[in-house]
Amino acid sequence: MANNLQKQLFAKKFKDAEEVLRTMDDQGNDAAPDTESDDLGELPAFGCGGIRPRRHASSMPVGDNDSWRKYFAVNEMFAIPERNFKFNTYYKLPQTTNAASIPVFIMHHGAGSSGLTFAPLADELYTRLEGKCGIFSFDARGHGETVPLDSTLEVPYDLATFTADFNAVIKTLQQRILQHKIPKEKLSIVLLGHSLGGSICTTAFNAMESALRSKVVGVAIFDIVEEAAIAALNNMSHHLATTPTSFATMREAIEYYIEKGLSNLRSSAEVCVPALFHKTSRGKAVRITDLASFQKYWHTWFVGLSSRFVHLPTSKLLVLAGSDNLDKELIIGQMQGKYQLVVFQESGHFIQEDAPAKAAITLIEFWRRNDNKNVVIKTNWGQWN
């Protein structure tokens, strides 16, 4: 019954969207995409086969603080005084810059998550691009190992603050590392955000310094739709009240996430779940992020997201774990070809953890189709027949 109701609502949204488009046409508005919007063609279509079998044995110690080493080369703190935080970062630089373009995927996780949520995806990207790329992820304020420089100061968690943090971290990454490791004419940045991280990416792009923004070839967001996200916030308090904040062991935490369907791949859960918890001296796993304390800022997180995303003056990719939750703004944008939409029907909310291989293939295709440094123009000029 719930599925039928969802389908009816979805059909109504399409009908409403079509009426809006007809009105726009009657008024003489151009329904074609902006010149700076996507012109991508079709990205890879994936079957609806089952998720890879879950592994029942871990290849690394549970809750091992060094588990990140399998996926990233460096774990470094970025101390940024103007943001009053030391940001815990993970990154991997290209093995070689012997290519026309070197993409750097800069990632932002969602609320209650951590930078290591992208670990499985990072591994897939780096492997498939044969080391000719950079990968960067980090823990946002209030998450993971990121900590305030001065803990006596108030710590806000509104969208504007998260966005300012993200841009400060990107600027630090560029000035401290990228400009010394990747020739500027080869650097291509893809911003990727999951859930709240997607909302942050849509605001961060326009707020970036122009020189750095010019290096961004596209913005990708994973499983986030404004209307659905705002509706979910209404149930957030109940969800938090019924979700354990601690477990007797880290193994118990991992098994809970798998059994509840919060993680669909055991291999991903082994690295992603421990990053959400602090391990006490007695082995107890205690959740790091207290989302309830963010409650007065929740209302800032998603309002206007769909419109911001659709109108970003760059290439855009939306990857969803199911298609029933598009809102009217996104439906109209999709009809007008404003962005690329890919749906992974078999994935859970954490697409980067549940379907890292498919997500990597999709991101690589998105980058290749939108990075003009990959275009090779062949000519016979000056050649004799």
From Swiss-Prot:
- The EC category is hydrolase
Instruction: Write out the function statement from the record.
Output: Demethylates proteins that have been reversibly carboxymethylated. Demethylates the phosphatase PP2A catalytic subunit.
Family membership noted in the UniProt record? Belongs to the AB hydrolase superfamily.
| EC number(s) given by UniProt | 3.1.1.89
- One cellular component (GO) term of this entry: mitochondrial small ribosomal subunit
Gene Ontology terms for molecular function: protein C-terminal methylesterase activity
Sorted alphabetically, the keyword list is:
Hydrolase, Serine esterase
Name of the molecule in the record: Protein phosphatase methylesterase 1
Q: Where is the active site?
A: S195, D223, H349
- Name the catalysed reactions: [phosphatase 2A protein]-C-terminal L-leucine methyl ester + H2O = [phosphatase 2A protein]-C-terminal L-leucine + methanol + H(+)
